[in-house]
Amino acid sequence: MNKLAIYLFLLLILSNCGFDNKQLEDQNVNSKIIFEKSKIIKKELNSNLKIKLNKLTKGEVFLGNNTNSTGNINFETNFKKTSSYKFSSIDEFDFNQPELIFTNDESLVFFDGDGSIFKVNKELKEIWKVNYYTKKEKKLKPIIYLAQSDKKIIAADNLSRINLINLKDGSLIKSIENNTGFNSNIKVFKERFFIVDFDNIIRCYSTKDGSELWNFITENPFIKSKKKLSLIIKGELVFFINSIGDLTALNINNGSLYWQTPTQSNLIYQDAFTLENSDLVF
């Protein structure tokens, strides 16, 4: 009797299992895929599309424009004549986003992977090339941010130094040391320039003698972000976004706070090193 009961019990369980599987099969037949896994597009989109740009802006000069990160570019779309200039490669070029500068004497200034700064003319012929780093510093592969102020080149690096360099011959005018490196573009306004360092401090320096005129401290995360920050000037205000996404507007003359607002959630504070900020543009 006990064996018969056990047999019937097992038969009942197996029958139920079979019924459940039948239900699952019916459900699978009637099911529909709502979300599909995205596929990587390997083909170039709009490969035949051609855009001719005569002028990017109207009424705004290119040199010294402070209303966006890199300035406005007026150019002709005739590439029949090309030139090249070879220099040692820069580590993590796309990540660091280094930018060359156009000077008011119709030349270009940039740097190479060893920290050498060079000036070339319109035909990319070298005018001068200098390097003011020690052998040990060269191995660190400094990233340099450049700007022009009158007859000076301002060269700030991610090692903690700002060099003021003579535009004509590349000679060193003055070297300024900071407590930490810099990681933003440089903006020049009248006789001062502005830059942000790794501690989320915006600093204002004199273009005449390199003295610090004022600074403004914003919230500083424990983990330092190496991503380049954005800095612009509009009217009498300087705007910058720090590594945790806070957008700040300051009085350009004395650094007093005009307003400040976060652009990210509070959770971003813990993940500041993964935050990728956009460039500021007016």
Residue ranges and their predicted role:
Residues N21, E44, G59, K81-F102, ...:
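Extracytoplasmic beta-rich repeat domains
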Residues N66, N104, D112-G113, D150, ...:
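Structural signature of WD-repeat beta-propellers
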Residues I13-N16:
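C-terminal motif of bacterial Sec signal peptides marking the signal peptidase cleavage site
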Residues N2-L11:
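Sec-dependent signal peptide recognition
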Residues N121-K125, N166-G170, S206-G210, N251-G255:
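Short loop/turn segments that connect beta-strands within beta-propeller blades
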Residues Q27-K43, S47-S83:
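Blade/loop signatures of beta-propeller domains
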Residues G18-E25:
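Bacterial lipoprotein signal-peptidase II cleavage site
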